[in-house]
Regions:
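C-terminal hydrophobic helical "lid"/dimerization subdomain
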Residues: 1, 200, 225-226, 250-254, ...
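Glycine-rich beta-strand-centered segment in the early N-terminal region that forms part
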Residues: 20-35, 48-97, 138-141
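Short, well-ordered coil/turn residues at beta-beta hairpins
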Residues: 34, 85, 240-242, 344
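Short, flexible surface segments
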Residues: 75-78, 167, 258
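NAD(P)H dinucleotide-binding glycine-rich loop of Rossmann-like/cofactor-binding domains
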Residues: 92-174
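Mid-domain Rossmann-like dinucleotide-binding core that forms the NAD(H)/NADP(H) cofactor-binding site
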Residues: 136-221
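Glycine-rich cofactor phosphate-binding loops and adjacent beta1-alpha1 units
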Residues: 163-165, 188, 205-285
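Conserved acidic E/D residue at the C-terminus of a beta-strand in Rossmann-like folds
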Residues: 199, 266, 290
Length: 344
């Protein structure tokens, strides 16, 4: 089968690999129908994910059809259309039992697919712990509608959930890339008083204004002053940092009011500075870390009910044979791209 593979730092390549086989009774083999490219794939390419293993098939955003299951799998069966969770987790360790599946202690737990084991930018993928890592797609939901459930939408849902948003809050979201928009969709479910999105890319700002006209937008240069003027207590009650740029972490805590919550969703290429003397007295609560993909069944239900719609994010579609072109487009943010669907 064809599989897009991490060769070395800076180099991915479409290569021929054997079709995966069941390796454990809790595995499933999924025929990938649709995959996508995530900014985390670019972090692997650039060498920013030290645990990524050269030689693995990349990709952790995908949907498909179950082809084969191990003897211990009971949640799904061959023929089921499924989303694939970016997190593989055992469901049995301390962290899994407490809902922190990103920190699963099993060797195949956490972010394994497309990082430490073969992922889904390929024709087939083996999914460990299939009962936890696969979710059936409701009959009325298309593959394109479900494509982001296992990763960027799960990230946005997790981030909005832990941010303790209320209907009285002013919420600032920094970054309107794919994860930022998915975070926005999930924040909107909380119905805060106002939502401000900080973004510098004109195409993304235009996308926000077109699809979410009640959301305020502002550039990074004007963000601090704008948030202070358009909030009730001199800053945002909740800030979600989804950009991961060199200056956005500082911007996040600067825009937060005293005693606010700052949720760091972004993955950074470089170390960030936490200048405690500068922020002394703000009494901020920081929440950080990777997505805990416990809510995929819930987000699929919300999609089926029409309460979440991520399909507008799919701006381009490529076949697997042209995945290098898809990466070139996505990495360089050409042609107004938000997300690329890859037909496998």
């Amino acid at each position: 089968m064809q599989a897009y593979t991490y060769i070395s730092k800076g180099k991915f390549e479409l290569v021929e690999k054997p079709k995966p086989v069941l390796m454990h009774e809790r595995d499933a083999i999924v025929k990938v129908t649709l995959a996508s490219i995530c900014s985390s794939d670019l972090h692997i390419k650039h060498g920013s994910v030290p645990r990524a293993v050269p030689g693995i098939t990349v990709g952790h955003e995908m949907v498909g059809i179950v082809e084969e299951v191990g003897s211990a799998v009971t949640h799904v069966k061959p023929g089921d259309r499924v989303t694939v969770n970016v997190e593989t987790f055992c469901g049995e360790c301390f962290f899994c039992k407490n809902g922190y599946v990103n920190n699963c202690t099993d060797e195949n737990g956490g972010w394994a697919l497309g990082c430490r084991i073969d992922g889904g930018q390929a024709e087939y993928v083996r999914v460990p712990f299939a009962d936890q890592g696969l979710n059936k797609i409701p009959d009325g939901v298309t593959d394109r509608q479900a494509l982001f459930v296992g990763d960027v939408l799960a990230t946005g849902y997790w981030a909005s959930r832990i941010s303790e948003i209320t209907e009285k809050d002013t919420v600032l979201i920094i970054g309107a890339g794919p994860t930022g928009i998915c975070t926005l969709l999930c924040v909107m479910l909380k119905k805060p008083k106002r939502i401000i999105v900080c973004e510098k890319d004109e195409n993304r700002v235009r996308f926000i204004k077109e699809h979410y006209p009640d959301v305020y937008t502002v550039s990074p240069e004007e963000c601090l002053e704008y948030v202070q003027k358009n909030s009730d207590h001199g800053g945002a009650d909740v800030v979600l940092e989804v950009a991961g740029a060199s200056a956005t972490f500082r911007l996040a805590w600067e825009c937060a009011r005293p005693n606010a919550i700052v949720t760091v969703v972004a993955l950074y290429d470089e170390a960030q500075t936490l200048p405690l003397p500068d922020m002394y007295g703000k009494n901020l609560t920081f929440k950080t870390g990777g997505v805990d993909g416990c809510d995929c069944e819930e987000t699929l239900r919300l999609i089926a009910e029409g309460k979440i719609d991520t399909e507008p994010l799919v701006t381009h579609t490529y076949p697997l044979s042209r995945i290098e072109d898809a990466y070139e487009l996505f990495e360089n943010k050409k042609d107004g791209v938000i997300k690329v669907a890859v037909e496998c």
